[in-house]
Amino acid sequence: MPQSTKYILPVYGILALYSLGYFSYRNGYVNIVLEERQAWLDMPPGDPTKVAQPTGIASLDETLAAMFVFYWPVLDGSFPGLSLMFCNYLGALPLCLVLMTLESLRKGNRSSFSFFYSPTFWGMIAVMMTLAVSIPWYLTIHLLISTTASHPTIENMSIPLAELKALIVNIVVGLVLPSLLVALPETITQTLFTRQTAITLWQLWPFWSTAVHFIARKFISATERGADSRAQWTRVRSAFRSVYGLTFAAAAIAHIATWSISLTAAYALPDAMSAETVSSLHPQTVFVNTWPWLPVTTDSVGEGTLWLLQWDKFVGVGAIYWWSLDLYRAAHTAQRKKINWYYFALKTVAFCLVSGFTGATIELLWEREEMIMEAGRAKEKTK
């Protein structure tokens, strides 16, 4: 494990606790959420779109009420900048979980520690504690115990074709589709479900994602029987490219769309909107983090949630980029190849411009995959 990661990833973990935990408490956000949660639980019946205690189980209803308070301003459009940041967030951190799932499926990670790589396990931790709090520690331990991280080879990095094809289905049906449904305006979805129902179901996305993957894998395994084994390498490479390509496309679309809306509102068409909306959608409001050590306070759930999402994304994406860089370097070391750091820096900047740090991370791991597969292919031909 490279020395840089030994220190950098734990620093990200500590930064997550400070910027998401301590900062949220100090700026008054936690107290506001608790007050709003109690107001939700005490809400009188009558509104069919808001049920105060949907399950009747006190502890569960309290947890759900906190989630409703958190997500309501994200989805109802009352804070345009927050809604835009959430769309940008969906095109970043959840896609990082796809990369983590990919690592969990590799042959070298199927051991007595396989439970550690479970995307369902880490997904539920992320739901309860935010992604940025959990991801740095997962990545640190992964680099310490995973053979695919320290000694990447075609053998230990291999993934069955059915698993790869199931992951493609999972990305579309288990991740992208639920995210789109929860982000749609209630005027569109109200005939199917209320916003409260959508939030509740979306919180269980790690289970839906796992179920989709399991069903798709079983179906695909049955259809793959009797397939021509001579074309196996080509089909596996094609499946890998589909996984990385879909993930990169989702990251790029979210990044370009959200930045385009923000820049258009701030500089191209500011007169077409109210001054309040223009200010809310300004890049400095949406994408520039509020430093957690400044003596600032918030008086609304929307503003506090925006600050939390900004730091959740910053820490989570930053940590996974360092992780991907170490995997990228390990692959080059294993193949005795040198990295042209000048070209690498230019390439990273270019990918960040069109797809953010998530897109740059995907590109690094994609290049690593291609390198190991080509080396393994060449080795097979010499036998």
Curated annotation (Swiss-Prot):
It is a multi-pass membrane protein. Keywords: Glycoprotein, Isomerase, Membrane, Transmembrane, Transmembrane helix. One of its GO terms (molecular function) is isomerase activity. It comes from the Eukaryota. Glycans are attached at N109, N156. Its EC number is 5.4.99.-. This is Terpene cyclase aurD. It comes from Calcarisporium arbuscula. GO terms for cellular component: membrane. The gene is aurD. The chain crosses the membrane at residues 5-25, 79-99, 121-141, 164-184, 243-263, 342-362. Epoxide hydrolase; part of the gene cluster that mediates the biosynthesis of aurovertins, fungal polyketides that exhibit potent inhibition of adenosine triphosphate synthase. It is found in: Membrane. Pathway: Polyketide biosynthesis. Belongs to the membrane-bound ascI terpene cyclase family.
